[in-house]
């Protein structure tokens, strides 16, 4: 587990087997991957709405999609499923989780849904896109909330450990700073 390997204490909860108040004691929250769509993922949507602006969050895959939906985005079911597929993507340099990385990165994709670019919420910024135009990264403009559609823990994402390290180190200071 990358987070533990980087020195952080980790507690894992199933998305339907915890009370929201249990999360008060944690410094940061990772919204992990999983099957299905956010509305079918237990307390995931309630968690985001409860802790937005109160706790830093990183959404991975399903967690990324949930962040999008929680703030008003829609999801699109892809005609082509990506499960264990390595593709390049472009990160725009506007999110500190990508600090120190080149604009073009390789990512491991395991999904069939994406956050739709149509009517994208004003409160979110797109931070990375795949070559086929799918949103691969997003962040909230005012809260310390970041999402990545791809899997940083995958061997297909060579710089995934850097992304997690950057997120763990980011303290929300200079949040609106350009990270290009």
Where are these regions (language model features)?
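N-terminal beta1-alpha1 cap of cysteine-dependent amidohydrolase-like domains
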Residues: 1-55, 62, 158-180
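Pocket-forming structural segment of enzyme catalytic cores
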Residues: 47-52, 57-58, 68-145, 150, ...
């Amino acid at each position: 587990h990358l987070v533990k390997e980087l020195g952080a204490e980790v507690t894992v909860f199933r998305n339907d087997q915890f009370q929201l108040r249990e999360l008060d004691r944690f410094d940061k929250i990772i919204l992990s991957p999983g099957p299905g769509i956010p509305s079918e993922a237990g307390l995931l949507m309630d968690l985001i709405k409860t802790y937005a602006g109160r706790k830093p969050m990183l959404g991975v895959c399903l967690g990324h999609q949930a962040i999008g939906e929680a703030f008003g985005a829609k999801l699109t079911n892809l005609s082509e499923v990506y499960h264990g597929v390595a593709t390049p993507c472009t990160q725009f340099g506007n999110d500190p989780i990508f600090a120190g990385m080149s604009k073009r990165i390789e990512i491991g994709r395991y999904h069939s849904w994406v956050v739709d670019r149509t009517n994208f919420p004003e409160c979110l910024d797109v931070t990375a896109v795949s070559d086929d135009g799918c949103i691969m990264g997003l962040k909230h403009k005012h809260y310390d909330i970041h999402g990545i559609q791809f899997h940083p823990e995958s061997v297909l994402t060579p710089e995934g450990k850097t992304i997690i390290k950057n997120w763990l180190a980011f303290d929300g200071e200079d949040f609106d700073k350009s990270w290009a």
